[in-house]
Amino acid sequence: MVQDTSSASTSPILTRWYIDTRPLTASTAALPLLETLQPADQISVQKYYHLKDKHMSLASNLLKYLFVHRNCRIPWSSIVISRTPDPHRRPCYIPPSGSQEDSFKDGYTGINVEFNVSHQASMVAIAGTAFTPNSGGDSKLKPEVGIDITCVNERQGRNGEERSLESLRQYIDIFSEVFSTAEMANIRRLDGVSSSSLSADRLVDYGYRLFYTYWALKEAYIKMTGEALLAPWLRELEFSNVVAPAAVAESGDSAGDFGEPYTGVRTTLYKNLVEDVRIEVAALGGDYLFATAARGGGIGASSRPGGGPDGSGIRSQDPWRPFKKLDIERDIQPCATGVCNCLS
């Protein structure tokens, strides 16, 4: 059974789960547990044409339901995933009203959740935390979480495109409205690696990994704020000291094949150092990068092992839990079908 969830009576925890839908898509056209979702969510899954996209949408919904179910102790059938107002339309969970509480078998616990999801190239992930809403209304205490997945080989083989440093530089130019001049220059000169130590092919591979590392970091940060690519300050958000995480040999371990997260990123906004956000990026296997960003709620910069920027607040255990690979049948089906013990 899935663990790594927090409650109002425990220290904050940043839970991170993911589902690899590639085996599902390769083995069946079925949509397992689709019938356990709300009708609107079932429709949203089935609207996709390609099976792999249906499976990613299904996995995204199942992860959101599971996270709410386990943290808020809400019956699966009562879970309704909402969205924040326009223009952002970010998935969220709105706690029930008092009248709704009475209809729940065990009652609403008063716990709310903050979460964010990402999906790319058949990989789906959620990062989130539980918290008790602050009666004082101080938004600075509310946690904010962002997560993003990139696939470093996403463009490989597209339309016969040559994979070279020159094609990478041309590709980077498309994103001049996303990255700052300094970030574009850092990617072009392959920051973080010695060009004399790698072959031409490996330099190209590193260049693409570096680009997608920057992309994942930027997406995770702006998704944390709720702005996404609509943020007017996108180019003013700058990352430096960025190193692309190396590919990780895939062992077939059911726990996943994550490398050591890279935590040395320096973040500035309008040239000012951002000190309240914790951000990191890690490689999964050879193709994927997962970036996570968080602030507030005891899971921001001060939650780093050893404390915050001033070295204070040492914790006995890192509240950021490692990514955990979930299996739909083993980990989610008991909760979705009402045979788990989560509410007891």
UniProtKB/Swiss-Prot annotation:
Annotated phenotype, changing residue 217 to R: In cfwA2; abolishes penicillin biosynthesis
Domain of life: Eukaryota
Disruption phenotype: Essential for growth.
Keywords: Transferase
GO biological process, one term: lysine biosynthetic process via aminoadipic acid
Enzyme Commission no: 2.7.8.7
Pfam families: AASDHPPT_N, ACPS
GO molecular function: holo-[acyl-carrier-protein] synthase activity; magnesium ion binding
One GO cellular component, as annotated: cytosol
Catalytic reaction equation(s): apo-[ACP] + CoA = holo-[ACP] + adenosine 3',5'-bisphosphate + H(+)
Function comment: Transfers the 4'-phosphopantetheine moiety from coenzyme A to a Ser of an acyl-carrier-protein. The enzyme is able to transfer the cofactor to a broad range of enzymes with acyl- or peptidyl-carrier protein domains. Required for primary biological processes such as growth and asexual/sexual development, and activates target enzymes involved in the synthesis of metabolites such as fatty acids, polyketides and nonribosomal peptides, lysine, siderophore, penicillin, sterigmatocystin, shamixantone, dehydroaustinol, and pigments.
PANTHER family assigned: L-AMINOADIPATE-SEMIALDEHYDE DEHYDROGENASE-PHOSPHOPANTETHEINYL TRANSFERASE, PHOSPHOPANTETHEINE TRANSFERASE
Family according to the record: Belongs to the P-Pant transferase superfamily.
Name of the protein this chain belongs to: 4'-phosphopantetheinyl transferase NpgA
Organism: Emericella nidulans (strain FGSC A4 / ATCC 38163 / CBS 112.46 / NRRL 194 / M139) (Aspergillus nidulans)
Gene symbol of the encoding locus: npgA
